Design a protein with these regions (language model features):
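Short linker/helix segments within small regulatory modules
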Residues: 51-60
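Conserved alpha-helix/loop element of class I SAM-dependent methyltransferases that forms part
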Residues: 68-89
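Conserved SAM-binding loop
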Residues: 87-192, 211-218
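Short cysteine-rich clusters marking metal-coordination/redox-active sites
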Residues: 39-42, 62-66
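Single conserved hydrophobic/aromatic residue that forms the stacking wall/gate
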Residues: 237-247
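Short alpha-helix
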Residues: 203-227
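Cys/His-rich microdomains that often coordinate metals
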Residues: 45-46, 69-70, 99
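Membrane-proximal basic amphipathic "stem/tether" segments
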Residues: 1-38
Length: 247
């Protein structure tokens, strides 16, 4: 099963996987129904979650109902418990919108919700993150999760994120970080998918961020807050994928 998951994730384009997931969801939910694992995003419970991972496959990682991963569920809890996202009037910009959040966010009456991506079939605005067709200071809240590690000129992308965010706005930018490394590792001469997988952990990544990720955000103009939100839950649940947040 784990080997099959790795093959599917590394061969089938993400846009096709997104479409297939919606078709298969009803059958998967029935097959895995139970009460051992609960997805906080929609409250559904299952006998187990699905395995997931491009290289090291994690058991019970992918929710059968929302297709959320650990980081998505953690972000949902952070938004719910630590922000006014669900009750304050906000204009929200969501990059590479995850299926786990899309319909939930669309139904929120308090937010004006725009989704944006260059390739995602779920986005309503098609644009390059390095050249956004958006006005300065036009959004109260920006979500950009696991996008910047795919972008060659991430500093330009960060500048664009800063440009379109209101001065008192909030941005949540998740990326994979190797917390053992002080500096980001990137090598743009590596273009072969297999070599990128070896170097950066995934075939379409162009870098592995180190702890200087936060410095890069500050250089773009952001005031950065580092949040170890997983520590609030480690005594209660097992979270397989460590995540760092800035907002």
């Amino acid at each position: 099963m784990n080997s099959l998951v790795k093959i599917i994730l590394n061969i089938i384009p993400r846009s096709i996987l997104t479409r297939l997931s919606f078709l298969l969801k009803p059958l998967i939910k029935i097959y895995l129904r139970g009460n051992k694992y609960v997805d906080p995003i929609d409250g559904s419970s299952f006998s187990k979650f699905l395995p997931y991972g491009y290289n090291n496959v994690r058991e019970n990682a992918l929710s059968p109902s929302t297709f959320s991963l650990e980081r998505h569920r953690l972000l949902w809890l952070y938004l719910k418990n630590e922000t006014d996202f669900f009750n304050k009037d906000l204009k929200v910009l969501h990059f590479a919108p995850e299926a786990a959040f899309l319909e939930k966010f669309k139904k929120l009456k308090n937010i004006s919700y725009d989704t944006i991506d260059l390739n995602s079939p779920l986005a309503n605005i098609k644009a390059d993150i390095c050249d956004l067709p958006l006005d300065d200071e036009s959004y109260d809240f920006i979500l950009c999760n696991h996008v910047l590690e795919h972008v060659i000129d991430d500093k330009k992308a960060m500048q664009e994120l800063y440009r379109v965010l209101k001065k008192d706005g909030i941005g949540i930018f998740q990326v994979p970080i190797n917390i053992s490394n002080k500096k980001t590792y990137e090598d743009f001469t590596i273009t072969d998918p297999k070599e990128r997988n070896k170097a950066f952990g995934q075939y379409d990544h162009v870098r592995t961020y180190g702890m200087d990720f936060f410095d890069r955000l500050e250089e773009a103009g952001f005031m950065v807050e580092k949040c170890e939100y997983t520590s609030k839950f480690l005594s209660l649940i097992h979270i397989s994928e460590p995540t760092r947040h800035s907002d």
